[in-house]
Amino acid sequence: MASTNSTNSLASITGALGLRATTVVAVLTCYIALCRGLRYLRRDQQHLQMPYKIREDFRKMTAEDAWKITKYVQSLEFPWMTKKALSFALFKTYGIPSISKLLCETQQLGKVEYAGRRFADTNILISEFLGYSPTSQRCNSAIARMNYLHSRYQKANKISNDDMLYTLSLFVMEVERWVKLYEWRVLTPMEICAFGTHWKGIGDAMGIDYSSLRHGPESFTDGLEFFEDIKEWAETYEKEYMVPDRYNHQLAEETTRILLANAPDALKPYGQNVVAALMDDRLRKAMMCDNPPPFYINMVKTVFGVRKFVSRWLLPPRPYAFQVRHVTDDPDPKSGRYFMTEYDSEPWYIKPTFSMRYSLLAWLRWAAGKPYPNGVGYSPQGYKVFEVGPKKLEGHGLDECEATRDRLMGSDRGRCPFAFS
């Protein structure tokens, strides 16, 4: 009897909708189930490949495994969102006057003529030590170059350990925060632990002191505890030191210009309100930015909400063949240089290939009178990691960088950074 009733009900639905409509509904339902199933299947498969099933296992997570997990998250699972999160992490550091003042005094971000290259150089170094194994030459060369660029200011007491620790904290936290707010799922505890473990290893290589953290300097149980500790510390630090300052405002203006470089001039005032809507109240106040009209805050929530819905229900996972790479894996066979694969305000280190020179973005930028990858200026020959930085430092610090890289390469950076905590 029950079977007969079900058959009759199905027939009634089919009759009411019509065969064509019923077929469309059935296909759409299957497609949604397939997309959602494939997304969670890949997440679960990634977890099965790693030996970190419970919290007790996290203390054994190696830096090499942590890097593999974070690379998967950033190149396959949430590439667009993690890039925006890392860009915003940098942006957020400009809300601390001790950081913004130094950057304005060096003129590397405070002046239009230098800001584009400074932004590209920073992206290169981050891409190099996030995109390649902690035991690789590329990762350790990037950290060595970054340490060299910082060292001059550290010796002059212009960069404090707290400045470095706060900057590191944002790279640890912002990806998790943005994914939680705007993506189709949150990061799992294992993934959060991986970000904590990976960045703890980078901080060690930078010589950052963790004494200010609850379990610092070296009593952290695992990457998840490190994540929780640095998040707690950063919140307290922001309350005291993220305060209004004209240097903050100057950098906010210049960075917003870079972020909106590809927007038509007529839309830039609206874009500035969108950027302001992405800030929290404390950051907006510190950067002396006007509060955006409520419409923009609601619009941002709506746009990201629609994106989250579409990603969760209507899009299959990104194929492995389409992993996102921000820099080239292989060097140019003649010059040994690498290239960036995308650009923001200026095409620094972009190889002027046919696809780059004649892309839709290039045509739009050409029509607007903006720079595009035509092989003129902006180092189209590519980059070498030890040359990255201000133009006046090209060719400087090579011996120091090589020595630091070799020391890091010999320090077993692939092991668990909490093994001796």
Tell me what each language-model feature is:
Residues 2-421:
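Mature, function-bearing regions of proteins
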